[in-house]
UniProtKB/Swiss-Prot annotation:
Species, as recorded: Thermodesulfovibrio yellowstonii (strain ATCC 51303 / DSM 11347 / YP87)
Name by which UniProt lists this protein: dITP/XTP pyrophosphatase
Binding site residues for substrate: 7-12, 70, 152-155, 175, 180-181
SUPFAM superfamilies: ITPase-like (SSF52972)
A Pfam family reported for this protein in Swiss-Prot or TrEMBL: Ham1p_like
Length: 204
């Protein structure tokens, strides 16, 4: 069985593969299809962006496509960065640029008011037109300085609820147990185990 991940982000692809390991699925990515164009993430919601990417990749490859759109919502900032998380400091911004902007906007905000949540929306689109959405969340707070070298995105400044370490201070295995992406992928995994036989001819 084959599914194409609609992403070129190496670390994200590794995380998705790691969490989905054990299923009888060959996981490809758009890196295996260099002719595919980048999809502009201009949706107003996570599910709009995830579906847009998955639909395009499914249409172009003729294979089921899986797309993840994730972001950080900070309560003190009214839910920002939200769907703009990857481009918070600009369309060409690096992770460090985005973190710098976030911490500048939270300067002076006390620890108890730095609450936030990571959101993950996974879209799975099949060639027969069927579409499915899976959500995952993890609550926590924003640290005052970046800590750790693991992960990507805002991991160095996100401390999940019940922990003292940031995501970036955790091993991949530790993070996988509690992350927003893990929650969404667990729902996807359950779906595939239950319903994949229906789509076997499309997944081969």
């Amino acid at each position: 069985m084959k599914i194409v991940i609609a992403s070129r982000n190496r670390k994200k692809i590794e995380e998705l593969k790691r969490i989905l390991q054990g299923l009888e699925i060959t996981i490809l990515s758009v890196n295996d299809f260099p002719e595919l164009e980048e999809v502009k993430e201009d949706g107003l919601t996570f599910d709009e962006n995830a579906l847009k990417k998955a639909r395009y990749v499914c249409q172009q490859t003729g294979l089921p496509a899986l797309s993840d759109d994730s972001g950080l919502e900070v309560e003190a900032l009214g839910g920002r960065p939200g769907v703009r998380s990857a481009r918070y400091a600009g369309d060409e911004a690096s992770d460090d640029d985005n973190i710098k902007k976030l911490l500048e906007e939270l300067a002076g905000v006390p620890s108890e008011k730095r609450t936030a949540q990571f959101v993950c929306c996974i879209a799975l689109v099949f060639p027969d037109g069927k579409e499915y959405i899976f959500w995952g969340y993890v609550r926590g707070k924003i640290s005052e300085i970046p800590r750790g070298t693991q992960g990507f995105g805002y991991d160095p400044v996100f401390i999940p609820e019940g922990f003292k370490k940031t995501f970036a201070e955790m091993s991949p295995h530790e993070k996988d147990k509690i992350s927003h992406r893990k929650e969404a992928l667990d729902k996807l995994r359950d779906f595939l185990i239950k319903f994949a036989p229906i789509y076997k001819q499309n997944l081969l």
